[in-house]
Amino acid sequence: MEGFDLSLGKGLKPLFDDAPARFRRRISGVDYLHLKGRQSGDLFITRAGWPAASSILPERWFTGAQFSKPGQALAGATGAVYRVPVAHPVRSNFALVVKFSRFGQDVGITVAGNELTDDAEFMSRVDHAEFLPPFEEFGNLMRLRNQCGRHFATKAPLAIYSPPTRYLAWQLG
């Protein structure tokens, strides 16, 4: 098991704002607490994810080779996106949406219509399109949430996990 110390070496789990500075990161405008696992995996937990940290630990939903048995692929998702129920101390119906990042992979856009394909600059951007890294995805989502307020309901981004083992795309779904 990867194992992460949610007490941050303090014995009791601190409040997000009381975490020691050595654990704090701000990436793409989002605040994280960065925890290093015993097997060298990295877990970046957002302010929204910190209250549920014990439920979002990777050992709750990822066995190292696959999702825990109840996980299921989300229909219509682009990429490997799963809904995985996990145990939560207060909420009986708690589930995570887990997405494996395809950062740096080609997007594979198909463009229809002559007016678009005649624009060389546009087609150059399409030809070089890649998926964003997860930190940029979270940053963009948080900017969107902040600009739209309560008029735009989304799930809160909780954490980014980078396992110590690297996987090929086909191994992740």
Where are these regions (language model features)?
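Conserved ATP-binding subdomain of kinase catalytic cores across diverse folds
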Residues: 55-173
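Juxta-kinase regulatory segment immediately upstream of eukaryotic protein kinase catalytic domains
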Residues: 2-72
